[in-house]
Structure formats: structure tokens, C-alpha cells
Amino acid sequence: MAGAMVSIVGRPNVGKSTLFNKIMGKRISIVEDKPGVTRDRIYGNVEWLDKKFILVDTGGLDPNAEDILFSKVRLQVEAAIDASDVILFLVDAKEGLMPEDEEIANILRRAKKEVILVCNKVDSFKEMPPTYYDFFSLGLGNPIPISASNGLGIGELLDEVVKKLPQEELEYTEETIKIAVIGKPNVGKSSLVNKILGEERVIVSNIPGTTRDAIDTPFSKDGKNYVLIDTAGIRRKSRISESIERYSVLRALAAIERSDICLLMIDATEGPTEQDTKIAGYAFENGKGIIIVVNKWDAIKKDNNTVNEYTKMVREKLSFISFAPILFISAKTGQRVHRVLETVDKVWEEYNKRITTGLLNNVLNEAMLMFPPPADKGKPLKVYYTSQVGIKPPSFVVFVNEPELMHFSYLRFIENTLRQNFGFEGVPVVISTRKRGEN
């Protein structure tokens, strides 16, 4: 399942990041970095044996991960358990069984999650180090031996991971609009969901989504079918306080993966935070429709310029999703909440929009006559034609003489031309180049 989450946990210095990077390097294709998107490489999309999941490096979640106190290791592990479907519990064969390993194992045994015990730093399978057998006492099954540094045993480990992934979640029809309500804790996600559903009063049913406790709520309005994926239901009462903010990003990932359109909720009293930027970046990189919903607008003192000034500030901080419409609402009072679904419908239309090849090339050819493709080191870039190759999000291929001659600034010009002529409000536009004659 695309939204399943697998976290690597363990005490400091057992090789969590090394294992993460080894799998990343072998099996993960990261979407190319876009200007303005904060990428902190703590997670990546993995596909193995036709199964997809999100791999999380918990070591990367805390900048001081390698010297944190044990109490923080415990918080980190508990937070990872809360957000994940499968846990890779990494131990160190060279150092052997440590008290911290036993404490983490105690936490994991109480958790109702799939746990795979992974014994790192085993350099050869011909003769296991004596310390390897000590880990059987943890009661978490046979340790899978690996060497994260040289890749030994990684394939066998991934085989085991896909066996333990949860079953596919409920499938909805292509016409059902899947909406993820995302944002950091206490921004008002549940209040917005309740207000939307309270207005419509046509809830079909509450369906427990995945093992992450997200709640899928299907409902209908004016003949259209929607599903609200509410990540707020994931945040349980917990002793975790310091880690909760960090892990809220992880909780949003699975919901984003399953959605078509994301409602990125921002607290009007705080403005966009670094956390909001991370969540928005993930939605953008995964090609989702995005609507920025500024909540708690009733708590802001206003004058004639407040909306314009606030809009400018949001655009500056979230410049990479400048295509996203901004709504100012109060989930508490219901102010302008009716506009949320109206905007979702508009973005959904843009998300599914197709442009005929003839019209597309007429518009682009006219624009390119005014602003011809640049030459690189004297060699001119020739653009032959452009085709739309997909929707959700709208995707285009530009056929050229030499793809390496295409500068990102000219791709940006093509994107801007498409937006000016065809709209695409609220959705990313994916443009790639291909040499003419290539399939």
C-alpha cells in the first residue's frame, strides 16, 4: 500500500542512517529538488516486489540524534511506533546486547505493530559473531543479519518488510475526490472536518482507515462523492511532548500519499512555520492539488490591507506552491467554510484538465516566437512539439533536439505560459523533456 510507513528505530550509533541511505541509494527515486522546497532527507518512497511504502529514518528526525539522552531515545521510539505500520528495530552485532536495546524491546513488545529485529554490522554470514545469538533473548523473533555499510542482507530484509505491510486500504472510485486535511497539531483540522460534515449532514459512514488510525469519512454533496482523510485522529493522548511536533510531519505523509487534494491548514496567529513548509513540500513533490487554508482568521485584528499583507507573506514563505489558492476561514465560527468545498471542486477540475495537442502547441509556439529557446554554448535548443501525457497532476512532455540544452528557467517559462492560458490553479504542472524519436 502506498501510504504504509516503515520506521527504523534503535539506540544511537547502531547504523540507522546508514541503513536508510543504503536502501535509498539502491531502491528509491527521489523527485528532483525544486527551488524553494525544503528537503530534509528523513523519508523516502520505496518500491520492492511491486509493493510501495514510506521509509523513515528516525535518526534524521532529531538533529542531536547521536548524542541524545536515553529518555529521548524512548520518546523517539514511542513516537515512531505511533506513526508507523512496521518497525525495523536495529541492533549492533559488534557491541552486542545493551540495556538500551532491552528497554526498546520492552516498548516494542507492548506495541500492536509489526516488528522486525535487524542485526547490523554482520560482515559475513559464514560465521555469525557470538553476540548475534544474544539478541534472541529479546523475544522479537530471529534477528535478520545485515551489513548496512556494504549492503549484505538488504534484499532479504526488504523481502521481510513487504510480507508484513498491512493489507491494501479501501479503494474508492476514480470519481471520488480524496481530500487530506494536513497541518501541524492544534491548527484546527478536526474542527474544520466537523464543520464541513456538520454543514452537509450526509455522512455515509466513518470507516477506520489504516493502522495509523486515520479516519476516512465518505460523504456526498450535489451528486459528488468525497472522502475526508483526517490525520487529526492519529494524535493520541501520549506522554510524548517534544517529539509530537516533529512526528506530525510523518503522520501527514500517509494521508498525502492517498489523497488527490490537500487542504494545508495554517494557523493565522502564527503564520506559515517550518513544519508547514515541510508538509507543503511533500504534497507538492507528490503531485497533489493544494489549497492553503488559513484558519483562526477571526482571531486576527484587521484593516483594509490585512488580507493583502497576509497573502503576500504566505506567498513569500511558500513560494514553491504559488499556484495554490488561499482561503481565510474560521473553523470555530464557520466563517467562509462553505468556500472550502467550492474550491476543492474547482481544483479537482484543474487536476483532471486535458488540453488538446493542437491547442497546446498553438499557444506554446506563439509564446516561443516571442521568447525563443536559448542557445547553450552556441548550440540552439530546438523545441519540436509538446504533448500532455497525464492528469492528476497535469503532465506534459516537450520533445526537443537535445534535452540537456533545456534550462530550468525555460521550463519555468513554459509552465507560466500554460498557467496563463489554461489555468491549472491549485495543481502542480509536471513538465519533462524528451529527445524527439524516443519513446
Swiss-Prot record:
It comes from the Bacteria. Signal peptide: none annotated. SUPFAM superfamilies: P-loop containing nucleoside triphosphate hydrolases (SSF52540). GTPase that plays an essential role in the late steps of ribosome biogenesis. Residues 4-169, 177-352 form the EngA-type G domain. Keywords: GTP-binding, Nucleotide-binding, Repeat, Ribosome biogenesis. GTP 1 binds at residues 10-17, 57-61, 120-123. One of its GO terms (molecular function) is ribosome binding. Associates with the 50S ribosomal subunit. This is GTPase Der.
